[in-house]
Amino acid sequence: MVQQQGMERINVGIFAHVDAGKTTTTEHILYESGRIKAVGSVDSGTALTDSMEVERQRGISVRAALASFEWRGVLVNLVDTPGHVDFLSEVERSLRVMDCAVLILSAVEGVQAQSEMIWNALRKLGIPTLIFLNKMDRTGADPAAVLAQARTYLSGDILPVQQALGQERNYAGAVDLWAEAADPAARTELLESLAERDEALLETYMSGAPLDLTAWKNQLKAGAAAGKWFPLVYGVAAKGLGITQLLDAMTDYFPRACGSLELPVSGIVYNIQRDKSMGRMAFVRLYQGTIRNRDTVMNYTQDVQGKVTQIRKVEGGRTEDVGALEAGDIAVVYGLSGVRIGDVLGVPDAIPQEAKLAVPLLTVRVHWDAAVDEHEVIGAFQELADEDPLLDTQWLQDERELHIKVMGPIQLEILDSVLESRYGLKVTFGQPSVIYRETPSRTGEGYVAYLMPKPCWAILRFRIEPGPPGSGLVYESLVRSSDLLPQYQNETARRVPEALMQGLYGWEVTDLKVTLTEGQHHVWHTHPLDFAVATPMAIMDGLNRVGTKLLEPILQVRIVVPEENGGRVMNDLVQMRGTFEPPVLQGERMIIEGRLPLATSLDYPVSLSSYTKGRSTFTSFFAGYEECPPDVRAERTRRGVNPLDQARYILSVRKALQG
């Protein structure tokens, strides 16, 4: 592996929509850099970054994979992320630890819905981004059309820094516009684009004086490193065309990772995996400080200390002890038992914000034969939930049922394979159900006086108000500490989110503000757990008074079909309660963008592919929750005793708290 300490570093994420050639590009990058001796293949299951057995079998990336190499004296930590929307949680976690990104677009399919979603997240986080326009040799490749599309849907500041030599079968590579061999007219177009975006460059350009191309390129480098401008390069990853130029562009236009080695440790755990012999592997991006083997590190999130046993670089199935992790670098830390994804190590000072992309929209029950040990199944899913917390594994003790949350059907297929290959367990999954939510219909109050059966005393009054869409839960207390002691207020605040997990229809209640307006305790009779019992009763009393509305998940979709199928697609969208923009014709293809309820469109991609004979693409991403029409009813069986039945609820909760 490459020498690391003291080197300049860049941490790069590779992102793409499904089938844009992302893993193939990564393999050729690793080969061109000398990191591997032969190019692996997605189809043959030999790609270095597809190290899981299921990835090799299925030919798709399931988990974000880390690889390191050196190029032009710079250490590059490259994270290859999954392209399929079902594994968006891996993309989300990778975004948080990247300093820069390569977004791969296909010169045939162009910008897809997932491309837009990833782009928006990159912009929200201010991550400098380079675009690699792949598959330039494919029939139907149209780089000019895709560039126009990218400038419309992504950014008007996408700037090609190469001139493509031909397209489709005639594609013969690309020439750097800064090189002497570049076509003067193409270079002038780049210079004019830069001048339009920078007043100082415009003055220089208009002066008529000879242009210093090195200075202009340095300005482009600065703008790209600042995330203002986005260089674009061309290539054919499957043939290795354009890979060297892509690597050069990465080291030219991307900023170096920074962070003081002397400041206190500040890092984040962005991935958890397991090693059969060494246990839990915590993938850590360190922003400042240094961690060494045998150091004791504070887990800020959990307020516990852990002893580091080893720090290793892991690539595919190969690992090497590197002894230390420095600011700006990424490595795997062993020895931190109980560490979880998202945990902050050291101090939180240098940790960047995160972008929320992945929202599980389906819930599924897990089934197994009577001969299978249920404890093994539950344990396996709990381990898998450590690696992907969005699975949200729930074991319902009374019902003897196991439920998980997933993004889509492909994820279920992968889970099935992983359970069999890693744990030797065979399970089946029930029919996926859409996860609805609830929100208050109007403003009102909830009240409880929990005074019997003694000993107990807790009085609470909440104001419940509808909030803006997507606002989640906002909680506030107006009660003075002299009326309700801080420890009781803290217990109440902690229990409010739990109380909202099941509303009047059994779904999580969201997009609301809850304000504690009154609270009382008794000097002798009150126990802190009294407020754990009282809070759900007051919340449910309030929801029962104000009523709740059902919310359903909505998808933003982009459908590309042959022109003759466009009319049927638009009719389908109407039948599914969807809306759409005026369709766009692109050659013989029709592009239709719109919004669809997930509940009505679960099976539509299969149906669409069938009647277009495989000549369609359907891409989507989660757009948010919206109010259901009045005729849509979706009620979920409540788990546990309803707090509205206060007598039974008090008895059941008291028994649970004491037991």
What are these regions (language model features)?
Residues 1-659:
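Structural and coupling elements of P-loop NTPases
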